[in-house]
UniProtKB/Swiss-Prot annotation:
Protein name: NAD(P)H-quinone oxidoreductase chain 4, chloroplastic
Gene Ontology terms: cellular component: chloroplast thylakoid membrane
Listed GO biological process terms: ATP synthesis coupled electron transport; electron transport coupled proton transport
Substrates-to-products reaction catalysed: a plastoquinone + NADH + (n+1) H(+)(in) = a plastoquinol + NAD(+) + n H(+)(out); a plastoquinone + NADPH + (n+1) H(+)(in) = a plastoquinol + NADP(+) + n H(+)(out)
Source organism: Ranunculus macranthus
Record InterPro entries: NADH_Q_OxRdtase_chain4, NADH_Q_OxRdtase_chainM/4, NADH_UbQ_OxRdtase, ND/Mrp_TM
Gene this chain is encoded by: ndhD
Bilayer topology annotation: Multi-pass membrane protein
Length: 502
C-alpha cells in the first residue's frame, strides 16, 4: 500500500492543533472559533481524501495499517488500521464534530478550553474507531471521558455537576469491566501479552472463558450504548449539557458502544456472541418499547429526545444480534442514520432554548408563528426520527427487520414475537415525536417573547446552515442507502464467516 502515516496524522492533528489554542490571546474569541472550525474542516478534508484515494471498498481486510512499537517491555504497539466497519463512523465523526464546533458559536466563557476539549474529543473518537490494538482501544475509550466530563461540568445547565458525576461514575464503572476483559484476552495462553486484534481473532478460547470475557466487554458497552438498565446517565447528561456537547454525545459517543460490540464481541468472541444473542435481542425489543413509552412521560424537551435515542439504540442491538449480514448492515446503517438525526434534534432543541429560555414542554406552545424556519427543520427531523419512508431512519429499521426475519438462528415463533414487539415500539415513536411537536409549536402562546424583532428571533444563517448540512445526508441515505451499505458489506460477510451455523 502506501507507507505515509495517514491515520496517525488524522488521529493526532486535532489534539496537537488544539494545544496551540492556549497560546492565543485571551480575548480573541472570534480567532479561536475560526481556528477550531478550520482545523475541523482540514481534518475532514484529509479524512475524505484518504478515503477516496487510498481506500479500496471491495477489500474486507485492514487497510492503511500502521504499527509502531510504543512500550517495549509490554509489547504495546501504536497499531492503527481501518476497514469497511470503521470508515462510516470516522466520516460521521468528522462531519458531526465540524458542525458541532459551528453550533458552539455562542459559547464565550473560557472559549479556549472549550474548543480545545472539542478537538481532544475528536482525536479520541477517531483513535477509537481506527485502533487495531486492544489496549490502545481501551486508552482511547477512557481518553474520551475526560473532555466530556469537563464539557458537562463547566458548560452545562443548573444540575450540571450532578449529571457530570453520574456520567463519570457510570462510564468509569463500565470501563473497569472493559479493562478486565482487555487484560484477560491479552494475557491468555502465553507469557507475553498479545494485544493485537489479528492474533486475538485467531486465538481459540474455552467457551466458559469466552463467556466471561464477553460479559466484561458487554457491561462496558452497555453503559455507553446504553442498554437498559444501565441507561439512566443518558437523560440526565443530555438534559444538562450544552447542545454542541449533546450533538457529540448523541451523534458519536453512543455509536462507540455499538462499534465496540461489533468489533470486539462479534469478531473476536463468536461462540459467546451466539450464546448471548437471543437474550440481547429480547433486551433490545424491551428497550425499544420501554424507552419510547418513558419518553412520552418526559416534560423536559431534551430528556424526551434522549429517551428517543435510547429507543433507537434498541434497533442496533437487534441488528447486531440477529447474526445475519442483512441485520448487521442494518445496525451499521442505523448507527450512521441516528448519528445525524439525534445530533440535529439536540441542536434544534438547543437553538430554540437559546431563543425562548424554556425547557419544559408544557410551558411552551405556539412557537411556530415567530420561528417558522426552526419549526420546519424540527418537524422534518422528527419525521426522520419516526422513520418516515424516504428518510434514513426508515431504510435502517427496514433492513434490521429483514435481517431479523431472515435469521437462521432463531425459530419462527420467537422471530414473529420480537417483530411484533418492535412494531409496537415503532407505533409509539410517532406518538411521542408528534406530541412533542404539538406541545412546542402548536396551540396558544403561553409566554412573553423577549424581543419584538421577529427576524432576529427566528433561525439565523448559521443555524440554518447546520440544519441543512445534516438534513441532506439524512435524505440522501434514505433515498439511496447503498451510500453507507457499500462501505461495510464485504467486511460484514467476513465477520459472519466465523459463525458456524450459517
Amino acid at each position: 500500500m502506501n507507507d505515509f502515516p495517514w491515520l496517525t496524522i488524522i488521529v493526532g492533528l486535532p489534539i496537537f492543533a488544539g494545544t496551540l489554542i492556549f497560546f492565543f490571546p485571551h480575548r480573541g474569541n472570534k480567532i479561536i472559533r475560526w481556528y477550531t472550525i478550520c482545523i475541523c474542516i482540514l481534518e475532514l478534508l484529509i479524512t475524505a481524501y484518504v478515503f477516496c484515494y487510498h481506500f479500496q471498498l471491495d477489500d474486507p481486510l485492514i487497510q492503511l495499517e500502521q504499527d509502531y512499537k510504543w512500550i517495549h517491555f509490554f509489547d504495546f504497539h501504536w497499531r492503527l488500521g481501518i476497514d469497511g466497519l470503521s470508515v462510516g463512523p470516522i466520516l460521521l465523526t468528522g462531519f458531526i464534530t465540524t458542525l458541532a464546533t459551528l453550533a458552539a458559536w455562542p459559547v464565550t466563557r473560557d472559549s479556549r478550553l472549550f474548543h480545545f476539549l472539542m478537538l481532544a474529543m475528536y482525536s479520541g473518537q477517531i483513535g477509537l474507531f481506527s485502533s487495531r490494538d486492544l489496549l490502545l482501544f481501551f486508552i482511547m475509550w477512557e481518553f474520551e471521558l475526560i473532555p466530556v466530563y469537563l464539557l458537562l461540568s463547566m458548560w452545562g445547565g443548573k444540575k450540571r455537576l450532578y449529571s457530570a458525576t453520574k456520567f463519570i461514575l457510570y462510564t468509569a464503572g463500565g470501563s473497569i469491566f472493559l479493562l478486565m476483559g482487555v487484560l484477560g484476552m491479552g494475557l491468555y495462553g502465553s507469557n507475553e501479552p498479545t494485544l493485537n486484534f489479528e492474533t486475538s481473532a485467531n486465538q481459540p478460547y474455552p467457551v466458559a472463558l469466552e463467556i466471561l470475557f464477553y460479559f466484561g466487554f458487554l457491561i462496558g458497552y452497555a453503559v455507553k450504548l446504553p442498554i437498559i438498565p444501565l441507561h439512566t446517565w443518558l437523560p440526565d447528561t443530555h438534559g444538562e449539557a450544552h447542545y454542541s456537547t449533546c450533538m457529540l454525545l448523541a451523534g458519536i459517543l453512543l455509536k462507540m458502544g455499538a462499534y465496540g460490540l461489533v468489533r470486539i464481541n462479534m469478531e473476536l468472541l463468536p461462540h459467546a456472541h451466539s450464546i448471548f444473542s437471543p437474550w440481547l435481542i429480547i433486551v433490545g425489543a424491551i428497550q425499544i418499547i420501554y424507552a419510547a413509552s418513558t419518553s412520552l412521560g418526559q416534560r423536559n424537551l431534551k430528556k424526551r429526545i434522549a429517551y428517543s435515542s435510547v429507543s433507537h439504540m434498541g434497533f442496533i442491538i437487534i441488528g447486531i444480534c440477529s447474526i445475519t449480514d442483512t441485520g448487521l448492515n442494518g445496525a451499521i446503517l442505523q448507527m450512521i442514520s441516528h448519528g445525524f438525526i439525534g445530533a440535529a434534534l439536540f441542536f434544534l432543541a438547543g437553538t430554540s432554548y437559546d431563543r425562548i429560555r424554556l425547557v419544559y414542554l408544557d410551558e411552551m406552545g405556539g412557537i411556530a408563528i415567530p420561528m417558522p424556519k426552526i419549526f420546519t427543520m424540527f418537524s422534518s427531523f422528527s419525521m426522520a426520527s419516526l422513520a418516515l419512508p424516504g428518510m434514513s431512519g426508515f431504510a435502517a429499521e427496514l433492513v434490521v427487520f429483514f435481517g431479523l426475519i431472515t435469521s437462521q438462528k432463531y425459530l419462527l415463533m420467537p422471530k414473529i414475537l420480537i417483530t411484533f414487539v418492535t412494531a409496537i415500539g415503532m407505533i409509539l415513536t410517532p406518538i411521542y415525536s408528534l406530541s412533542m411537536l404539538r406541545q412546542m409549536f402548536y396551540g396558544y402562546k403561553q409566554f412573553k417573547f423577549k424581543s419584538l424583532n421577529s427576524s432576529f428571533f427566528d433561525s439565523g444563517p448559521r443555524e440554518l446552515f447546520v440544519s441543512i448540512c445534516i438534513f441532506l445526508p439524512v435524505i440522501g441515505i434514505g433515498i439511496y442507502p447503498d451510500f453507507v451499505l457499500s462501505l461495510s458489506v464485504d467486511k460484514v460477510e467476513a465477520i459472519l464467516s466465523n459463525y458456524f451455523y450459517r
